Design a protein with these regions (language model features):
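Phosphate/pyrophosphate-binding loops and the adjoining catalytic core of nucleotide-dependent enzymes
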Residues: 2-136
Length: 136
């Protein structure tokens, strides 16, 4: 069993973040949620999109979506409009963060986790997974 050193991960995360290189993902997110009830927060290599109508639960389901350099934008175009229509909180790895995550020095436990979705309950989780299974 691998044990992830959280302090090392946080330090690596903050060292690699460059806001100038996250503009593609960020502008796409802004177009999708511009008039929705969301709050965007940048934290390290992530852009957190918090639904103001459905606050994050203290515990519950998480859905991770992986991506490569070849398909990340296509995945964004499919996934983001759907989860925004459900008013679900999620986070996306920024442009620079994506490159960092795919590097050989990044902790393997975190590699490729491009989008994390936080469903409100089991029913919503199943619905999202069903959509993703058909669409991706």
């Amino acid at each position: 069993m691998n044990i992830l050193n959280i302090n090392l991960f946080k330090k690596y995360d903050l060292m690699q973040y460059n806001p100038k290189e996250s503009k593609i993902v960020e502008s796409m997110l802004m177009k999708q949620i511009s008039f929705k009830n969301y709050q965007l927060k940048k934290k390290g290599i992530f852009i957190n999109c918090i639904s103001l109508n459905n606050p994050l639960q203290y515990q519950g389901w998480k859905i991770h979506i992986s991506a490569s350099n070849n398909n990340y934008f296509d995945i964004l175009l499919i996934v983001i409009p759907y989860i925004v229509s459900l008013n679900v909180s999620f986070k996306v790895v920024s442009e620079n963060g994506r490159n960092t995550m795919l590097s050989k020095n990044f902790p393997r436990e975190q590699t490729g986790k491009f989008i994390t979705i936080y469903p409100q309950n089991t029913v919503q989780c199943r619905a999202i997974i069903s959509f993703l299974n058909k669409s991706l």
